[in-house]
Amino acid sequence: MTTEALAPLVSRGLVAAGLATEAELASQADWLSSLIELLKVRARTVDDIVHQARPYFGQSVTYDEEAVAKQWKDKDATRETLQATHDALAGVTDWTLGSTETALRAMAESRGVSPGKIFQPLRVALTGSAASPGIFDVLVVLGRDRSLARIGGAVGRLGPGSI
């Protein structure tokens, strides 16, 4: 089904789930289309898309405790990695797939770690889950301010230190 055909169905589901109002969705039609395009790949039904869309609404994140336990095992190291991730992304002004990817891959290289050591903890910080679309897609769909706020919230959840 095309994104255009899915949009009204997904919109009804999002409103019914209390994630947004019709007016909010109408004012963000392009953003909603981008989100649907991103999520429909992993979905079989409209309800699947609505469920997958939850992390993209609101300011806070509901963390899957299994994802937290697996991806944030070493809280101090994860906090430090997410703080460094925040710092690297805070310097990105042109928030695109390419610019966020460049910043994070450069950070991984400068730290001598594989990108996955950064991307997986970041995925949990942004979506609360260990599974999501590509991390750069997630960053772009969430937007700069919300992404940085969620990373900061994750750092705070992990203990001492602040952004």
Language-model-derived ranges and their functions:
Residues L97-G161:
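Charged substrate- and nucleic-acid-binding regions of tRNA-handling and nucleotidyl-transfer enzymes
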